[in-house]
Every structure is written in structure tokens, then in C-alpha cells.
Amino acid sequence: MSRRKTTPSAGIVYRLETTKKRDLSVEEIRSVFEAGGDELVDMFLLMFLLIGINVSDLFALTKENIVRGRLEYDRAKTGRHYSILLHPEALRIIEKYKGENKLLRFSEHFRNVDVATVMINKKLAKVRPGLTTYYARHTWASIAFNIGIQKDVVSLALGHSFGVRVTDTYINADLSRVDEANRRVIDYVLYNKK
């Protein structure tokens, strides 16, 4: 008697779903900057100015994360270290909403990051229906690429690997390329300078 092998997934067809587009056009992000002034909307704008920092990372920041004019932190999702030059536009928001124990007071007002995220997203939805914190990172990346910043610099700014993890250990990335890319994105969005 022969045994027929079966697999639990036999006959199942898998579809790869593409990631939902979560980027704003330049005009749309400009309109969010124009609507700014509310603390929670300004947290979204700060996320954009900081190359799309995640809410959980922003929530966890303390004053010790600012070192010699740079924001130094390890991303909670990946553990990867980030070092972002604090441009004046970001510093203005940080100064306006500085916390006592945390870098930003919104981190002290909410019980946890999940509550903070829900509240930010509710406020953003009033500015633009469907807008969430995820848009900050996606929008920064799309604008950077569309104004001519090389894809490898965009990837470096977002903390993506260069493909071979072993190679990454040998590469000492020039952060000035990321600093310049972020300055170009900010200048284009806020001052229409390409």
C-alpha cells in the first residue's frame, strides 16, 4: 500500500498584497504644515522633519537623545541606530513642546504610546481624512526620491540594509549625505526650493 503525501496548504493560492500607499503629495504635506499649530499635528510634522521617525520612537525620547545637535536613538522596531541632524524647523517644534522628563511633553500626557498614536491619528483625520502617522515616513521617502535624491541615500536615511548584512558592518556611512537629503526635502516642502 502506498502512502500519498499531502500538505496542509495543498490547493491554496497565495497572493502577495502590496503595501498600501501612504504618502502625501508635496501640496498635501504643505497643507498639513499650514494647518499645524496643534500639538498633536505638530508631532506628525516633527515625525516628517525627522525622516519619518516612528511614533513609538518619538514617544520614548528623552533629552539625553540629543547629542551635539543630533537626535541619537535606536529604532524600537529594528534595533538599528539612527543619528539625525536636528534642523532648525525640528528644533523649534521640540522647544515648543519640550517635556519635563521626556524630550516631548506629549510622551508625558498619554498613558502609553498606543493611546498617543490613537489621539494623534484622530487629530490628523480632522486635518485630512485617512491621514495617519505612517504617512510621515512614506511621504518623506517619496518626496526625497522625487526631487532627485539617490535611492541609496533614501534607503540609508530610512535605515534600510544595503542588501548584504555582512557588508553593512564594513560600511561607515557618511551621514552628511542623509543630513543634506533631509535639508533638501525640508527646503522643498517648506520653502519650495529644489
Q: Where are these predicted regions, by residue range?
A:
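Basic, Lys/Arg- and aromatic-enriched nucleic-acid-binding interface segment
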Residues: 3-55, 137
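Short basic/aromatic active-site micro-motif
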Residues: 129-147
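C-terminal secondary-structure termini that scaffold catalytic or DNA-interacting sites
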Residues: 107-112, 164-165, 177-194
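Short, polar N-cap/turn motifs at the start of nucleic acid-interacting alpha helices
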Residues: 65-70, 130, 149-171, 192-194
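Active-site/catalytic core of tyrosine-dependent DNA strand-transfer enzymes
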Residues: 25-29, 87-129
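A short, glycine-centered helix-capping/turn motif at helix boundaries
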Residues: 46-60, 147-149, 160
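Catalytic-site neighborhood detector that most strongly recognizes the C-terminal catalytic loop/helix
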Residues: 23, 75-79, 158-184
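Conserved tyrosine-mediated DNA breakage-rejoining catalytic core shared by Y-recombinases
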Residues: 11, 50-53, 59-96
